[in-house]
């Protein structure tokens, strides 16, 4: 069974990778056709980051008690 630390590390790596893909203006951002535009990360990522006390790593997350 994987340790909590390794699972947390994998989740954070996945979040950073997914955020990089959807950040507007990044060179790797996929362009969508029609009326759709690239959106920022969903609240699920921020909720997870805040619960794990890593919200300070994501400037778009507004956690209560967030470190600077």
Swiss-Prot record:
Segments crossing the lipid bilayer: none
GO molecular function annotations of the record: acetylcholine receptor inhibitor activity; potassium channel regulator activity; toxin activity
Signal sequence, renumbered to the chain: 1-27
Subcellular location: Secreted
Record carries keyword Disulfide bond: yes
Disulfide bonds: 46-61, 50-63
Modified-residue entries (Arginine amide), positions: 64
Known function: Highly inhibits both nicotinic acetylcholine receptors (neuronal (alpha-3/beta-4) and muscular (alpha-1/beta-1/epsilon/delta) subtypes) and the voltage-gated potassium channel Kv1.6/KCNA6 subtype.
Family note: Belongs to the conotoxin J superfamily.
Domain notes: The cysteine framework is XIV (C-C-C-C).
Name by which UniProt lists this protein: Alpha/kappa-conotoxin-like pl14.2
Organism: Conus planorbis
């Amino acid at each position: 069974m994987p340790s909590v630390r390794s699972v947390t590390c994998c989740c954070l790596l996945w979040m950073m990778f997914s955020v990089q893909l959807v950040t507007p203006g990044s060179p790797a951002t996929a362009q969508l056709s029609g009326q759709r535009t690239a959106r920022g990360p969903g609240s699920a990522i921020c909720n997870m980051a805040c619960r794990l006390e890593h919200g300070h790593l994501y400037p778009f997350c507004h956690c209560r008690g967030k470190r600077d």
